[in-house]
Amino acid sequence: MKNMSQRSMDVEKKAANADSCSVSTSSINVDDADVALRFLKQNGLDESSTANEDDVVAGEEANFYGSHELSPKVLRKVDLFILPFLCCTYLLMFLDKALLNYAASMGIKDHLKGNEFSNLGTIFSAAYIFMEPVVTYLIQKFPISKILGTFITVWGIVLACHAACKTYASLMVVRTLLGLFESSSAVGCIAISGMYYTKSEQSARIGFWATQAGTGYIVGGLISFGFLHYHGTAFTSWQIMFLVVGLVTVAFGVLTFLYLPDNVTNAWFLNKEEKIQVVEHIRANQTGLETKKFKKQQVKELFLHDKFTWPMLLLTACSQISTGAIGTFSVTITGTFGFDKYETALLQLPIGAITAMIILITTQMLSRWGHITLITTSMYIPAIIGCIVLISLPLSHKIGNLFSLYLLYSGSCVITNIYIWNSCNTSGYTKRVFRNAITMIVYNVSCIIAPQMFRAYSAPRYIPAKIALLVTQCVCVPLQLYIGYICKKENEKRDKEQEGQERKKYQFLDLTDIENRNFRYIY
C-alpha cells in the first residue's frame, strides 16, 4: 500500500506539470517525456498552445477515433510510406517461418525420424522466446528502423543458409538462428503502428499488415508448388526454395534499414507542418509516440499491478495453441486425408484466402464500430465446430475434414485482435513494448507446445492433439468475455472519478494507462 501511495504521488507530480491551463511544457522534464513532447517544444509549441481537442470529441469516442482530424492527404502519405514496410515485414516473417511447413511435402522429412520434424518447429519458437526480451530492449533504446532492418537482413541470410543443410543437426542450428532474428518482427510492427495512427486507425492498419499471414499461405503454397517441379541433382527443391526466399528477405532488410523512419518526428516523407498534424492526431490515444529512456517501474507495473496482464496472457496461450498446431502440421494433416503432395500444396492456397478474409473483415469491423470483445468471441465458434468435426469424422471423408481444418483458422486469427488490444489499451512506451514482448513469448510457448501434441504414435488421426485444440478454444470464450467486462468496469470507474472535473493534459508525459486516469480502454 505504501508503494502504491508513493506511485500515486509521483503521478500527481507529473500531472500537475501537465495542466495545460497553468503550466507550459517548459516546466516538464522532457527527458522523461515522450519524443512527441520534445518535438513540439523544439517547434515552439506546447500543451497550452494547442486546441482543447477533448472539447471537440469527448470520452471514449475521442479515445477511439481521435479528436483532431487528420488531412486525408497526410493520412494517405503515411499509409503509402509506412504500410508497405509493415506488410512486407509481416509477410516475410510469416512466409520464412512457414517454409518448413511447405518443405514437409517437398522431401525435407525424408531423412528425419520420429519427432525430429516437430523439434524443428519447437526450437524456432524456443529461440524466439529467448531473444524477445533482448530485442524489445534494443527497440526501446535504439532507432527502431535500424534494429528491424538489421534483424530482417540477418534472418534472410540464415534462411538462405537452409539450402546448405543436409543433416538434422544443421537444420536445428539454422532454425535456432532464424527464431532469434525473427523475434523483432511482430513487436516492431505493433510499435510502429501505434506511432502514426489513432486507435480506430490502428485496428484497420494492423488488420492490413496482419492479413499478410494469409498472403503468406498463398505465396508459400504457390512457391512450394512451383519448386516441386524442380528436379536438380545438386540441390533438392526445398533447398532452392529456401535460398530464393532468403535472398529476397535480405534485399528487403536493406531497404528497411535505409528508408523506414524511426518515428513521426523524423519521417522523411512529411514536412514540419504535416508532422505536427500527425502528432496532434494521435494525441487522443493517450499513448504518445516513443521514448528511449527505459523505465523499469513500467515493467514492474505490467507484471505486478496491471489486472489485464495475466488474463490476456492466458487468452493468448489458449487461443494460439491452434496456430502452433496448424502452422507446423497443416500440410501433414491435409496429407492424412488422402491427398497427394501436389494436391496438398495447392490446398494450402484456400487457407491463405480464408485467413486474409477473416482478418480483414474483423479488423475493419473493429475500426468502424469497436466492440472488440464481441467480435473476438465470435471468432472462436467456427474453430470449436471445426475441432468437433475433425475428432468425429473418419479420415475417408476428405472434404468434410478439409473444411473443418479450414475452420480452425478462425481461432488462430485472434492473434491480430490481441495485437490491436495491446496497442490500443497500453500506455507508457516501456510498458507497451514489453507487453508486446511477453505476448509474443507466450505466443511462441504455445507454438512449442502445440507441435509436441502431434506425437508419432497417434498418427494419422492425432486424436489427442485435436481434443487439446477443442478444449483450449472453448476456454477462450469465457476468458475473452471476462477481459471485456473488466475493461468496461474500469472505464466506468474512471468516468465516475472525473465527474465534474476538468481533464488535465497527460498525453505526452509517457504515463502508463494506470497512471493516466484520462486513459480509456477499448472493449
Swiss-Prot record:
InterPro entries associated with the record: MFS, MFS_trans_sf
Transmembrane annotation, as ranges: 80-100, 119-139, 142-162, 177-197, 208-228, 240-260, 313-333, 346-366, 372-392, 401-421, 433-452, 467-487
Protein localization: Endoplasmic reticulum membrane; Cell membrane
Cytoplasmic compartment residues: 1-79, 140-141, 198-207, 261-312, 367-371, 422-432, 488-523
UniProt KW Flavoprotein keyword: no
Keyword Nucleotide-binding among record annotations: no
Keywords: Cell membrane, Endoplasmic reticulum, Membrane, Transmembrane, Transmembrane helix, Transport
Family matches, as CDD domains: MFS_FEN2_like
GO MF entries: transmembrane transporter activity
Any matching Pfam family: MFS_1
Inducing stimuli: Induced by limited extracellular thiamine levels.
Domain of life: Eukaryota
Membrane disposition: Multi-pass membrane protein
GO CC annotations on file: cell periphery; endoplasmic reticulum; endoplasmic reticulum membrane; membrane; plasma membrane
Described purpose of this protein according to its UniProt entry: Transports either thiamine or, rather, a related metabolite involved in the thiamine biosynthesis pathway.
Family affiliation: Belongs to the major facilitator superfamily. Allantoate permease family.
Record protein name field: Thiamine pathway transporter THI73
Organism: Saccharomyces cerevisiae (strain ATCC 204508 / S288c)
